[in-house]
Amino acid sequence: MKIVVDENMPYVEPLFGALGEIIPVNGRTLTPEQVQDADVLLVRSVTRVNAALLDANPKLKFVGSATIGTDHVDLAYLARRGIPFSNAPGCNATAVGEFAFIAMLELAARFNSPLKGKVVGIVGAGNTGSATAKCLEAYGIKVLLNDPIKAAEGDPRHFVSLETLLHQADIISLHVPITRSGEHKTLHLFDEARLMSLKPNTWLVNCCRGDVIDNQALIKVKQQRDDLKLVLDVWEGEPHPMPELVPFAEFATPHIAGYSLEGKARGTFMLYQKLCELLAIPANKRLSELLPPFHFKAVELEQTPDEKALLQLARFVYDLRDDDAVFRNGFAKENGFDIMRKNHKHRREFSALALAYHGQSEVDWLSNLGFSGVGR
């Protein structure tokens, strides 16, 4: 069995090696010739999976995408051909939620404006939006949710209109898929008028899709409103962000909000489970076996951490400033964006760090944030 796989997908060999011949490829430049005799195709969001790519392959048995979204896959085409498809919904939700939360802590420290006491509006209450809300609510932050689709589906959570959210939120975090038409179109959801309407001193965090914000309009608005603070992990025109926009972002990264080791492993592992199910063979590998030990065995807490100490704990796990510096130095180089993504292998989730605390104060919130070993 030939398994054609994006070369940047981790843990493929230990999971799929016993199932067939693994053929690594560049996912962004993948050609029909490279997949014409594949039995299995495993991709990420940089690969367009459609008739143009697959028409020459008569034997494909499974397509898997190690991603939350599916906008890069022609699902109707796969269905017509009877090719099973699976993605990995929620695989990197924890990573994205923690990224957004850490970014807010970093902004709070940079501008001496505590996160505690602010109101955060989350646009899009799916897996990543919910994971962001989980972090914020664990820390005691008031969260407003906007998601008209979830609301219409009967989701029991309380939702507000986008206008209400814009009016009340001090921080806005975007977590919607890209939809280019229809009643709930998200393409340029934040256009010039909406950006100009943001409250004074709003923080805007985007780690969903670059096109959700009109980037050209964002440049224009930032030229007029220095009070708006931006965290941008995604960009229109990836892998070629608008160079004029980068200096306006407080933190800029190359679409890696979901790139924790845990999230990457989870995405590949979910596809492994699905393929084993299709082949009717036992999935006898374990996710925990894939991850390396964390470089800190445990951190002893002498007292309940304040916001400054919480940021330091977060930096033990992931220091956003490092990726920001690498991005500014490398995004304009040839293939710089993709090279940074490919080389991004170091980040862990809060769960990798064990905290030891034996005081009397309530620290369940640290456990709810995701840290392990709290109070043990």
UniProtKB/Swiss-Prot annotation:
**General function of this protein:** Catalyzes the oxidation of erythronate-4-phosphate to 3-hydroxy-2-oxo-4-phosphonooxybutanoate.
Q: Is this entry keyworded Cytoplasm?
A: yes
GO molecular function terms attached to this record: 4-phosphoerythronate dehydrogenase activity; NAD binding; protein dimerization activity
- Residues bound to substrate are S45, T67, Y259
Name the family the entry cites: Belongs to the D-isomer specific 2-hydroxyacid dehydrogenase family. PdxB subfamily.
Q: Which gene encodes it?
A: pdxB
Which pathway does the database say it acts in?
A: Cofactor biosynthesis; pyridoxine 5'-phosphate biosynthesis; pyridoxine 5'-phosphate from D-erythrose 4-phosphate: step 2/5
For the protein in the UniProt heading, the enzyme class is: oxidoreductase
Q: Primary place of residence?
A: cytoplasm
Q: Which UniProt keywords apply?
A: Cytoplasm, NAD, Oxidoreductase, Pyridoxine biosynthesis
Q: Which residues bind NAD(+)?
A: D147, D233, G258
Fill in the subunit field for this protein: Homodimer.
Superkingdom? Bacteria
Question: Which reactions does this protein catalyse?
Answer: 4-phospho-D-erythronate + NAD(+) = (R)-3-hydroxy-2-oxo-4-phosphooxybutanoate + NADH + H(+)
Q: Which GO terms describe its biological process?
A: pyridoxine biosynthetic process
Location comes to: Cytoplasm
Instruction: Record the organism.
Output: Shewanella sp. (strain MR-4)
One family from Pfam that matches here is 2-Hacid_dh
Q: What is its EC number?
A: 1.1.1.290
Q: Name one GO cellular component term.
A: cytoplasm
- Protein name, entry field: Erythronate-4-phosphate dehydrogenase
